Amino acid sequence: MRVGIGYDVHKLVDGRDLIIGGEKIPFEKGLLGHSDADVLCHAIGDSILGAAALGDIGRHFPDTDNRYKGYSSLKLLEEIKRIINEKGYYITNIDSTIIAQKPKMLAYINNMRKNISKVLDISIEDINIKATTEEELGFTGKQLGIKAQSICLLNKNI
């Protein structure tokens, strides 16, 4: 068994869709980034790669590569799954947290879990997503951006 952690943060800006966990969430701002800036998928991807000691998403999908401009982070997760499977690893479970003052995430979490379980080809019961605020403190509390954290447990085929 191997464990990895992931963390990501993106700034909220006007003129972009808000995509979290592959789900388009109605909100007046979206996250700024080279890809679709899906903060949750990025944290999950980093936790998976970290558990396999394979670096991070920046190494595999650099923001200097135009192939990933506007790229779906769900597709990044599909690629990450392929990468770890080639090394003999499979995902046991994922636990993650979205940190955002607004919008409220509860209504979207089940669809996020479905989206992520589908692209990673794991049971929805093996993915947990929580949401919290920072009680109007700091970067997320002042609604300047959104953060996500993730932990992943991998096993290796013998």
UniProtKB/Swiss-Prot annotation:
> Has keyword Metal-binding?
yes
Q: What are the entry keywords?
A: Isoprene biosynthesis, Lyase, Metal-binding
One GO MF term: metal ion binding
Q: Give the pathway.
A: Isoprenoid biosynthesis; isopentenyl diphosphate biosynthesis via DXP pathway; isopentenyl diphosphate from 1-deoxy-D-xylulose 5-phosphate: step 4/6
Record field: catalytic activity: 4-CDP-2-C-methyl-D-erythritol 2-phosphate = 2-C-methyl-D-erythritol 2,4-cyclic diphosphate + CMP
Which cofactors are reported in the record for this sequence? a divalent metal cation
- Record-annotated site: Transition state stabilizer: H34, T133
Q: Which PROSITE patterns match?
A: ISPF
How is the cofactor bound, as the UniProt entry phrases it? Binds 1 divalent metal cation per subunit.
One Pfam annotation reads: YgbB
Task: State the superkingdom.
Answer: Bacteria
Give the enzyme class.
Answer: lyase
The alphabetized list of GO BP terms reads:
isopentenyl diphosphate biosynthetic process, methylerythritol 4-phosphate pathway; terpenoid biosynthetic process
Q: Where does a divalent metal cation bind?
A: D8, H10, H42
Concerning SUPFAM superfamilies, the annotation shows: IpsF-like
Known EC number(s)? Answer: 4.6.1.12
Residues bound to 4-CDP-2-C-methyl-D-erythritol 2-phosphate are 8-10, 34-35, 56-58, 61-65, 100-106, 132-135, 139, 142
The protein's assembly and partners:
Homotrimer.
The protein's name is 2-C-methyl-D-erythritol 2,4-cyclodiphosphate synthase
Organism (species): Clostridium tetani (strain Massachusetts / E88)
